[in-house]
Amino acid sequence: MDDFKYNINANYTGNVRLQKWYQTNCKYFSPKWKYTLPWWESFKYDKILLNIQKKILFDISNKTILGNIFNKYNINIPNINSCLINKYRDGQDHIIPHNNIYNSFGKYPTICGLSIGDTRYLRVKSIVNNYKKINGLSKLNKGICDVNFDYLLEDGSLLIMAGASQKYFSNEIIKNMSSKTRYSLTFREFII
């Protein structure tokens, strides 16, 4: 996992981190980005990644606490087939407010994010859907925020975002003073 791609749009989009995209069929995140955004090149799953994915799917599909929550609230169990690994080298690597509203994830995507390494805060805000396009990417304009929560993502924690969460909330990893590395393994269903 040493061949992470640097997001060369970092100065333009404000997203500073390294990333690697895995997809079971080795598809690009978006075919139109294939030649312009090389950090979205797809890599084939390895055994370790596949085992982590199977464990997450088992927990949300069966009579576990997580599975019971999915059942109680009629949350669709995703057919996870992709994983974006973000590498935050230190506390200065971050991602700006965003949400995952791409057609390639479906109308109401379920996102399962596993944190490994340093503890970081995830900020969640309610939003007014107001976007502008930057190099083909949807970037949130500043909108009215009614809700603002910071969640502590510790080593080994699993964050689930499901239902209409991507429509009504943005999320970001905020900067801090840490000098330690954090990995975020974000599993989801990629449908295109």
Residue map of PLM features:
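Non-heme Fe(II) oxygenase metal-center motifs and adjacent flexible, charged/small-residue loops
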Residues: 1-192
